[in-house]
């Protein structure tokens, strides 16, 4: 049987300028958010955008977000309550995303808890 860990981190409502979290969430909560229908209209609109600067502005104002690194009173390193034990990796402009995903999933030195392509 696979062992699970209850990681805990802060969840924030859009826009990105909002620095106070509304609650603590875990990996399963984020997974459900990603695969659910809550952000589907925003995701579809974002994927139609041709300009990367327009897309960046849109993401900052239309998507909720979380701080995978831990629980915070406010989104500021000095306001950290507890580190989650997670490390968040963000890869931009990857040519072969399928190959990179497999490398991460099969890596011998760390376990991948959640892996997704952001909108």
Q: In which residue ranges do the predicted regions lie?
A:
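Catalytic phosphate/metal-binding cores of nucleic-acid and nucleotide-processing enzymes, i.e., regions
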Residues: 79, 102-108
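Short, surface-exposed ligand-recognition loops at beta-strand->loop->(often short) alpha-helix junctions
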Residues: 90-98
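Short loop/turn segments at strand-loop or loop-helix junctions that form parts
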Residues: 7-13, 91-92, 117-118
């Amino acid at each position: 049987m696979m062992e699970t860990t209850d990681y805990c981190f802060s969840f924030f409502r859009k826009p990105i300028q909002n620095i106070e979290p509304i609650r603590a969430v875990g990996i399963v909560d984020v997974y459900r958010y990603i695969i659910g229908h809550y952000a589907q209209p925003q995701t579809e609109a974002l994927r139609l955008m041709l300009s990367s600067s327009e897309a960046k502005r849109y993401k900052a104002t239309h998507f909720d977000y979380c701080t995978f690194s831990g629980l915070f009173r406010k989104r500021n390193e000095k306001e950290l309550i507890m580190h989650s034990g997670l490390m968040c990796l963000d890869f931009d402009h990857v040519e072969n995303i399928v190959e990179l995903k497999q490398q991460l999933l099969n890596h011998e030195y760390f376990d991948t808890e959640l892996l997704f392509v952001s909108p």
